Structures are given as structure tokens and as C-alpha cells.
Amino acid sequence: MNMHVDMGRALTVRDWPALEALAKTMPADAGAREMTDDDLRAAGVDRRVPEQKLGAAIDEFASLRLPDRIDGRFVDGRRANLTVFDDARVAVRGHARAQRNLLERLETELLGGTLDTAGDEGGIQPDPILQGLVDVIGQGKSDIDAYATIVEGLTKYFQSVADVMSKLQDYISAKDDKNMKIDGGKIKALIQQVIDHLPTMQLPKGADIARWRKELGDAVSISDSGVVTINPDKLIKMRDSLPPDGTVWDTARYQAWNTAFSGQKDNIQNDVQTLVEKYSHQNSNFDNLVKVLSGAISTLTDTAKSYLQI
């Protein structure tokens, strides 16, 4: 089947498995000018960097623990290294910038290379798939911007929760060898601050709201105008589980509360982990898209040159 037909169908319906298959066959169809993984990395598009940084942030969050009493001995909680989350956001932002720059370069090559080869007067009609490719590049840039904005916002939220979890041990202590004291009111105030300052993100103009709602699930809500808001339900459950300041619980009751409270923290982690996995999948789709686009540009340019030689 003609590569252009296959590609047009795959791009129109966003059939990423089909694009992946096309990317694998591109060397046979488009000569030696298709973009390789090494080319992507040379252009600064190395998905491993942001994904490793995000993985480190998830690991850091997972390592957080509340103070506890184990075998009769009080054990301090573990605080987070918050710079890990900053590093992840910087990596996501830098990777998105490199992806966008690469698409803009391909767009220039597509419009300049194929049309300029045909001459200013346009001796031939543009390939029917040309406008489709331009549209796909535009959609690709929109998706990059959206994912970068959302992942950055979720990472900031993740960091805020990690900060609260780190401060918990300042308000939890051993009353004696059988009881724990918890200043729940102060912890409530910390959690409420996070709820009151949850980051909001804006999808790019023209984004498919229904598609993004399906993509992101119930960890966030998306308004009809494309405003993305983090679902605070898990934080609210954590806040509402807390007792007043100065509460004393025996070890069994404290541990039961700790288990439920930490369970909500784990649920937040799962939400972010799921988004990071989707972000990784999006990066894989991007790599395959670029390989297909670069091969198509090579083919279209060769076609234009061949026409002029007739």
C-alpha cells in the first residue's frame, strides 16, 4: 500500500500503533533521511531525561512516612527532598521546548523544502497529504504544550503534598510509651493551604475537551473552556480524618489512622504515576510521529524534484 495513504489514514484517526509500524518501515520507504533516535537526542529530544526525573520524584514521594511507634519505640517520619520535584518540572519544560522546536523545524522543511523545490510559481499542485501533515504538526505542538502544562502542574501539586507530609512529624510526637499525641488542627491548616492553592492549568485554544477528559480521567476536572483543576477529594479526606490539636491516641488507634491517612497519600501517588505513564506514552507517540514526518518530508521533496526533471 502507498505510504502516503497509510500515513494519511493513521494521522487522521490518531492511530498511534499504525504510526509506530510506519516508523519502523520508514527506512525502506523513504531512504536514509528519516530521523533516528540518535537524531532526536541530538536535537535535544531525549524522553529519558524528563521521565527519569519524574520517576525520581515519584520515588521520593513514595519514601515519605509518618512518625510511628514500632515495637514500643518511637520512630521519626521521613522528610522529602523537595528539589527533586523542581528538577522534574525543569526537565519536563525543557523537553517540551525541544519537542516544539523540532516540530517547527520540520514544518519549515515541509513547507519550504517541498514547495520551494517545485518553484515559486508552483509548477505542480501540492501533495494532497501536505496540508494534513501541516495540521498534524499543529496538533502535535498543541499536545506538547498541553501535556507539559498539565505534568508541570501535577508535579507542583505533588511537591506541595510532599511538603505537608514532611512537616507532619513536627506535629506528631510520643506522649509516653503507649500513646501518641497529634496536633491535628495544625496539620489540617497545612492541608487546607494546599487545597486553597491547587494549581490550575489551561488547555491550548481549540483543544478537544472531550478527548482530554478521557485522557486524564477523574484525577482532574476540565471545564468547557479548557481549565484543568486538580480533584481535591483525597486531600479533603486526609484533612477531615484529623482530630483537634492536642489529641492523644493509643498506639492502635494512631496506627489505624496512619494507615488510612497514608492510603490517601498513596492514592495521590497513583494518580500522578498514571499521568506520568500517559506522558511517557505521549513521548513515544511523538518520537514515532517525528520519524514518520521526517520520512514523509524526504519523500515529498524527492517527488517534487522528480517532477521538475520530467
Curated annotation (Swiss-Prot):
Compartment annotation: Secreted
GO cellular component, one term: extracellular region
SUPFAM superfamilies: IpaD-like (SSF140693)
Keyword Coiled coil: yes
Primary site of residence: secreted
Keywords from the UniProt entry: Coiled coil, Secreted, Virulence
NCBIfam families from the UniProt entry: SipD_IpaD_SspD
Similarity annotation: Belongs to the invasin protein D family.
Domain notes: The N-terminal domain is an intra-molecular chaperone that prevents premature oligomerization of the residues on the coiled-coil region that are involved in interactions with the needle and/or itself. The residues in the C-terminal domain probably form oligomeric structures at the tip of the needle that are responsible for the regulation of secretion of other effectors.
Functional description taken from the UniProt entry: Required for invasion of epithelial cells, as well as for survival within host cells, escape from endocytic vesicles and subsequent actin-tail formation. Probably regulates the secretion of effectors BipB and BipC and their final integration into the target cell membrane.
Protein name: Translocator protein BipD
Organism: Burkholderia pseudomallei (strain 1106a)
UniProt lineage: Bacteria, Pseudomonadati, Pseudomonadota, Betaproteobacteria, Burkholderiales
Protein's gene: bipD
